[in-house]
Each structure stands twice: as structure tokens, then as C-alpha cells.
A protein has these predicted regions:
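N-terminal interaction/assembly modules
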Residues: 1-169
Length: 169
């Protein structure tokens, strides 16, 4: 039996893939799957789906930039979503070692995609891991993960009066 996190990655892939295939909002489908509970959606699977969606613009930007010879649209849907999960784990899941994120993505590709997919996914994720220290993680297209709760401007500071000075007209 595969470890719990491996099963959770597979379940997250199922949700991302199904939503894309059926043209459904991912988070709505995730909520439906959690409610139905058959098959169950582990908390880590839900975290992966939500994390991918929060950072999707930046993740897709990175795939487009580093997937030599492939555009997102031309790539098999399974590969595209395996890469999204792998990149999310590499860049934002601090408790997952890079090697684990890469090898788990390669295993998913080996089980579910084309013969060429594992090598392609391994190469792309290894490149992202190598560049990780220099990558800007937030895209201008991503929503600010921590918006300012009070968007009102700061009041201008008024200098304190100086004793003995006359006010300017």
C-alpha cells in the first residue's frame, strides 16, 4: 500500500485533472469531493489542491518558462497537473524535501502518463529545484496572500510646534 502522502498526491491530481477536463472550478470540485467523501480526500490532498490554486499563475509561468519545446496547452493534461503539484511542493511546501517532491511527481507520471513523461517531469522539476534560491515566488498575477486588512492611507505626520517659533502665513 502506498504511503498516505503518495495517495494524497494522487487524489490531488485526480481533482485537478477532473476539473480541467470537465471545465469546472477546481475549488468547487474539491469542496464537492470532500463533502461526498467517496473516495475520501485526505487533508494533505486538499492542501495540495488549494496551494496549487493559490500559486497557479506563478506555477504556470515557471512551467512555460522552463519547459523547453512545450507550451502548457500542448502538454498532456496529466503532465501539466503533475508539474503543478511538484512545483508547489518544491517552492511552497517547506516540510517536503526537494528530492521527495521530484521523485513522487516522477512516480505519478510513470503510472499515469506517457513513456516520455517521467524523464521530462524529472528534468523540469530538477531545474526548478536548482533555480529555487533565485526564483521570485510571487507573480504579479497571483493574489497577494496577505492583503493589508486596512487599505486606508496612513495619516500624514504633522510636525510638533517648535516653542518660540512663529507660524508661517
Amino acid at each position: 500500500m502506498p504511503p498516505a502522502r503518495s495517495k494524497a498526491r494522487k487524489r490531488a491530481l485526480d481533482v485537478l485533472f477532473e476539473a480541467e477536463l470537465r471545465g469546472l472550478p477546481v475549488l468547487d470540485l474539491l469542496a464537492e469531493r470532500i463533502t461526498l467523501g467517496s473516495p475520501p480526500v485526505a487533508p494533505y490532498a486538499a492542501d495540495l489542491v488549494r496551494g496549487v490554486m493559490v500559486h497557479k499563475a506563478r506555477i504556470d509561468e515557471l512551467i512555460g518558462e522552463y519547459a523547453e519545446g512545450w507550451t502548457l496547452d500542448r502538454m498532456p493534461a496529466v503532465d501539466r497537473n503533475v508539474l503543478r503539484i511538484g512545483i508547489y511542493e518544491l517552492l511552497w511546501a517547506d516540510d517536503i524535501p526537494d528530492g521527495v517532491a521530484i521523485s513522487e511527481a516522477v512516480l505519478l507520471a510513470r503510472d499515469l502518463s506517457t513513456d516520455a513523461s517521467p524523464a521530462f517531469i524529472n528534468g523540469l522539476l530538477a531545474r526548478i529545484a536548482e533555480l529555487k534560491p533565485s526564483l521570485e515566488l510571487e507573480s504579479p498575477l497571483d493574489p497577494d496572500p496577505s492583503p493589508d486588512p486596512d487599505p486606508s492611507p496612513e495619516p500624514a505626520e504633522v510636525p510638533a510646534p517648535v516653542p518660540g517659533a512663529t507660524p508661517e502665513p
